[in-house]
Swiss-Prot record:
It holds the Pfam family Ribosomal_S11. GO terms for cellular component: ribonucleoprotein complex; ribosome. Located on the platform of the 30S subunit. Belongs to the universal ribosomal protein uS11 family. This is Small ribosomal subunit protein uS11. Part of the 30S ribosomal subunit. Keywords: Ribonucleoprotein, Ribosomal protein, RNA-binding, rRNA-binding. It comes from Methanopyrus kandleri (strain AV19 / DSM 6324 / JCM 9639 / NBRC 100938). InterPro entries: Ribosomal_uS11, Ribosomal_uS11_archaeal, Ribosomal_uS11_CS, Ribosomal_uS11_sf. Residues 116-137 are annotated as: Disordered. It comes from the Archaea.
């Protein structure tokens, strides 16, 4: 019992890290569990100068680190991660920055809970662009 008295149990404050990773950019938003309050919002384009580097893993890593620092200042200690690709008519796989962003969040000191893919998948909604014969290259 004596050893427990010295320890203070720190209450974890959970949030959600929404990572939108396309092949053009990576956007990281950290919100509360309901998604109503935004604690931090960073993108690859905010941390690099060249447009072609917005979607790179390096830009995603820098953006995720800054978002994590900003959220931790506001009291968030742990996050559930929701990864999203463009989906719909676009690619259904996340861009190159998704994995780098998750690793950067963990390295910054945030505890990672669930990792979930929330890419919108059409259940045969509208016709894809390109017409009957498809896109002829």
């Amino acid at each position: 019992m004596a050893e427990k008295e010295g320890k203070k149990e720190k209450k974890e404050r959970w949030g959600i890290a929404h990572i939108y990773a396309s092949f053009n950019n990576t956007i990281i938003t950290i919100t509360d569990l309901t998604g109503a309050e935004t604690f931090a919002r960073w993108s690859g384009g905010m941390v690099v100068d060249a447009d072609r580097e917005e979607s790179s893993p390096y830009a995603a890593m820098k953006a995720a680190r800054r978002a994590a620092e900003e959220a931790m200042e506001k009291g968030i200690t742990a996050v559930h991660v929701k990864v999203r690709a463009p989906g719909g008519h676009g690619p259904k796989t996340p861009g190159p920055g998704a994995q780098a962003a998750i690793r950067a969040l963990a390295r910054a000191g945030l505890k990672i809970g669930r990792i979930e893919d929330v890419t919108p998948i059409p259940h045969d909604g509208t016709r894809r662009p390109g017409g009957k014969r498809g896109r002829r290259v």
